[in-house]
Every structure is written in structure tokens, then in C-alpha cells.
């Protein structure tokens, strides 16, 4: 199959990010043209190191640019308690000499977008700081973005605060700017990603699959979003799955606003499912997932990796 969808991936690896990067690299329908890193799960220095380690592991020739070290207006609150101090605890990657591009992520994204023959798809599976910086500094780039597919937000409960999902809560000002920008957005939030559970039986078969399966199995052993006994949630992988298998998701067009001021609600995505606010929809929000179909696709795409 010839790859038909050219994508840019903005990420903060992160254990489930590693699985998403594998899918972005090896799903035959996708052509990954740039990876950018952002502070989120751990510091941007660590997310950059982790992404470079993964590219070296797979001998993948994809450029990488380091992005924002802090949210727009707030100090970074990371998720090392979920992913480990390094962000990818559990596997000993070999040393390498790879380096990021000598320009910040938002400029690297701009350069790829402006030189592309047609609008491209952005995929963001970390805080939206880099995407907001792109749209703030180069608003003309919006015309070159086919759509933004993001992992973040929730129409209900949060996983970082009672109401807020981690990626949005880390930099709510950036998320608010992106949702107000007018670009087409597909939001894969906790409503679907909490359903995207890889079962213990699925996980037990990974080491026999290939060296990627062995590596991911080692990482998942240290991933605190679930356990090897009960299953692990593949939050970030949902954004990649939607690109390739959108029929697995039930979407609804909604108006989404991001709360930036509330003492208890900052970072909350206000998803107006019933249209009570009278605002035009600015996102397609994923609300349900075909879990069996998702697991089947994950098995297929992991099998495509070395």
C-alpha cells in the first residue's frame, strides 16, 4: 500500500507516545515527515532524548525538532509519576549520535507546512504549546493545515484534576488558543482513550511479535496507566488510529472551550454536546470507540514494525 497521508507528529514521549510513534512510522497508510517534541510527560530535554532514542532504535530517517520547554504562561507540571523519571523507564536503549534540528519546533513545522504541495495533517499527542506558538507567530500557516488530530481533553472526568485531562491542563492557554484558531480539529479525549485498553492477553503476546514488541512490552511493564495484570491504556495511540481507521470512532461536532481561569477547573475542556451555549462547532469530538477493532488494528500495525 502506498502511503497517502503526510503527517507531522508533535509528542512528549512518554511510554504510550512510544507506541504512537511506532504506529506513525509503520502504518503503511501514513508518511511521517517530521517529529517535534514538547515538555509534558517529562522535560523537553528528556522527551527529545526519548524521541531520538526511538528513531535510532528503528533506524528511522525522520527529522526531529525540539520544542517548547515550558507552557506559555505556567510552570511545567509533568507526569513522571506515570512514565518514570526518564519518561521511558523499562528499556535500555543503546547510545547514538543523533541530534535535533537546529531550529525550534514551531519553525520546523512552519517550514514543512509551507513547502508541502498540499495541506498537511498535524497530530498532537502532548500539550499544545508548539501548535499554539505556530499559530501565534505564523497565523498564515492555518491555511496549510488540513486538520489537527489531538489526544487531549474530555467531555466528562479528568485524569489530572477532577475535570481536566493532562495534556490540556499542562498548558490550557495554548489549548484555548488552538481551539479558537478556526483550524479543523478532531479531539480524541479521555472519553475514548480510557476505552483503548490493551488486555493482559494482548500484552503477553508482544515479546514474540518482533523487537518492537519486546521493547514496548518492557516499557509497558513500567507504565502506570494500568498494569500488565489488568491492561494498559493507549491514550496517544488513539490519535494515530483515527487517521487510519476513523470508522472505529463515533464523533460528534461540538463547540469546545478551554477553561483557563478557574481555581478548580483550569484546563477543563467544556464540550457542549447538547448545543446549550449556542456557539458554532469548532471540533469533532470522539465519544465512543470500537475496542475490539482498535485492538485488532494495533496488532496489525505493531506487526508491521521490525
Curated annotation (Swiss-Prot):
The keyword tRNA processing does not apply. One of its GO terms (biological process) is purine nucleoside catabolic process. One of its GO terms (molecular function) is purine nucleosidase activity. InterPro entries: Inosine/uridine_hydrolase_dom (IPR001910), IUNH (IPR023186), Nucleosid_hydro_RihC_nonspecif (IPR022976), Ribo_hydro-like (IPR036452). It is an enzyme of class 3 (hydrolase). Its EC number is 3.2.-.-. The active site is at residue 235. The keyword NADP does not apply. Keywords: Glycosidase, Hydrolase. GO terms for cellular component: cytosol. Signal peptide: none annotated. Belongs to the IUNH family. RihC subfamily. Hydrolyzes both purine and pyrimidine ribonucleosides with a broad-substrate specificity. PANTHER family: INOSINE-URIDINE PREFERRING NUCLEOSIDE HYDROLASE (PTHR12304), NON-SPECIFIC RIBONUCLEOSIDE HYDROLASE RIHC (PTHR12304:SF15). This is Non-specific ribonucleoside hydrolase RihC.
Amino acid at each position: 500500500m502506498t502511503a497517502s497521508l503526510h503527517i507531522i507528529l508533535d509528542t512528549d514521549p512518554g511510554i504510550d507516545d512510544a507506541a504512537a510513534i511506532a504506529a506513525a512510522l509503520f502504518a503503511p497508510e501514513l508518511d511521517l515527515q517530521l517529529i517535534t517534541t514538547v515538555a509534558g510527560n517529562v522535560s523537553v530535554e528528556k522527551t527529545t532524548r526519548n524521541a531520538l532514542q526511538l528513531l535510532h532504535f528503528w533506524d528511522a530517517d525522520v527529522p526531529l525538532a525540539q520544542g517548547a520547554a515550558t507552557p506559555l504562561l505556567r510552570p511545567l507540571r509533568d507526569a513522571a509519576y506515570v512514565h518514570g523519571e526518564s519518561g521511558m523507564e523499562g528499556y535500555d536503549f543503546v547510545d547514538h549520535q543523533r541530534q535535533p534540528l537546529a531550529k525550534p519546533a514551531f519553525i520546523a513545522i512552519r517550514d514543512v507546512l509551507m513547502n508541502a504541495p498540499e495541506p498537511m495533517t498535524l497530530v498532537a499527542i502532548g500539550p499544545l504549546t508548539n501548535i499554539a506558538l505556530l499559530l501565534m507567530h505564523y497565523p498564515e500557516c492555518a491555511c496549510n493545515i488540513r486538520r489537527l488530530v489531538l489526544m487531549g481533553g474530555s467531555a466528562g472526568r479528568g485524569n489530572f484534576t477532577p475535570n481536566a485531562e493532562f495534556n490540556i491542563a499542562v498548558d490550557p492557554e495554548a489549548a484555548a488558543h488552538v481551539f479558537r484558531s478556526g483550524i479543523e480539529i478532531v479531539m480524541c479525549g479521555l472519553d475514548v482513550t480510557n476505552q483503548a485498553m490493551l488486555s493482559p492477553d494482548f500484552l503477553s503476546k508482544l515479546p514474540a511479535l518482533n523487537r518492537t514488541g519486546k521493547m514496548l512490552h518492557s516499557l509497558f511493564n513500567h507504565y502506570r496507566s494500568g498494569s500488565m495484570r489488568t491492561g494498559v491504556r493507549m491514550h496517544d495511540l488513539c490519535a494515530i488510529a483515527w487517521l487510519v481507521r476513523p470508522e472505529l470512532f463515533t464523533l460528534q461536532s461540538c463547540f469546545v472551550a478551554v477553561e483557563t481561569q478557574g481555581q478548580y477547573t483550569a484546563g477543563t475542556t467544556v464540550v457542549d454536546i447538547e448545543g446549550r451555549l449556542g456557539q458554532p462547532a469548532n471540533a469533532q469530538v470522539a465519544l465512543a470507540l470500537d475496542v475490539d477493532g482498535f485492538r485488532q488494528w494495533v496488532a496489525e500495525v505493531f506487526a508491521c514494525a521490525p
